Amino acid sequence: MKKIVNSIYDVYSEKLPRSFDGIKLAMLSDLHDNVYGISLEKLYGMIVEQEPELVIVAGDLLTRKHSDGSDEVVGLLKRLADRYPVFFANGNHETKVKVYTEKYGDRYNKLMQALKKAGVKILNNGHLDYKKNGELIHIYGLEIGREFFLIRNRPSMKEDYISGLIGMPLDGYGILIAHNPMFFKQYAAWGADLVFSGHVHGGIVRLPFAGGVLNPDYTLFPHYDGGEYREKNSTMLLGRGLGTHTINVRINNPPELVTAVLHRG
C-alpha cells in the first residue's frame, strides 16, 4: 500500500472572523483518476481522523489521457460530501477536457454532473459564502485559461485578469482555490487571504535540501514545488498532490493530504 502523508499548517490572519478561529480544512489535489493507485479508503480515513469542517479540492480529479478511475474518485468525494461541505475548482486537465470536446466527448459534462449529484460545490470562476455563528468567509474558485499552462509562449497574467473572471474580492476573509501556483503573486495582488493550489506534484522527484526537481512546464528545481508560501498578507498552501499522470512516478515524494488550521491573529 502506497504511503500517504498529512502535512499540517497553521495559518494566521487578523481578518479571520472570531467564529472561525481554529477551523480546520482538508485539501486534496491532483488525484488524476487515481492512476497512481493510492488507497482511497485509507485517504478517506485520514481525512475523517483530522475532523475538518470543510474539504477543498484544488483541481485535476481526472487525467485527460485516461478514461477510467473517475467513478472511484467521485465516490470518495461523495462520501466526504456526506460529512462535510466539499468545494471544488477545475484544474488544467478538467479545462482541457471541457474545451476539446471533439477529442474527449462529454467526459467533462459527465464529471460535473457526477460531482453535483455527489453534493460537491463546484466553483469555477465563482464563489460561495460559508457562514458560522452569524459570521462568514468567502470561498472562490478560479479557472484560468489554458494558455497559462503552456510550456512555451506562456503569456504574463494582466493585472485585471482575475477580477475579469471572478470580480473583485468581497470584504472579509477570502479563500481562493487556484490550481496553478505559478501565479501566486497575482492571486495575492488580487486580494486572496489564503490560496490552495496543486498542479506541480511536488516536483515529481524530491531531493534532500533541494526540494522538487521538475514542474509540469519542465522547469528544473521550481520555486513553487510544495509547502507554504507568503506574499504580503497572503498565504499559499501548495499541495504536492495525490497522484500522477504522464510521468507515473513519485520519488521521495509520497502523495500528500494537506490540513490547514486557521487562526485569528
Regions found by a protein language model. Name each.
Residues 27-29, 54-60, 85-92, 123-126, ...:
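Active-site neighborhood of phospho(di)ester-bond hydrolases with catalytic His/Asp-centered motifs
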Residues 13-26, 120, 127-139, 169-171, ...:
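Beta-strand-turn-beta hairpins that frame and shape the catalytic cleft
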Residues 1-35:
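Acidic, histidine-bearing metal-coordination/catalytic regions of metal-dependent phosphoesterases
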Residues 39-130:
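Core catalytic region of metal-dependent phosphoesterases/phosphodiesterases
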Residues 98-120, 127, 132-174, 184-185, ...:
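Binuclear metal-dependent hydrolase catalytic cores centered on His/Asp/Glu-rich metal-binding motifs
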Residues 180-258:
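Conserved beta-sheet core of the metallophosphoesterase superfamily
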Residues 33, 61-64, 92-96, 128-130, ...:
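Solvent-exposed loop/turn segments at secondary-structure junctions
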Residues 25-41, 61-71, 95-106, 148-156, ...:
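Acidic/histidine-rich helix-loop elements
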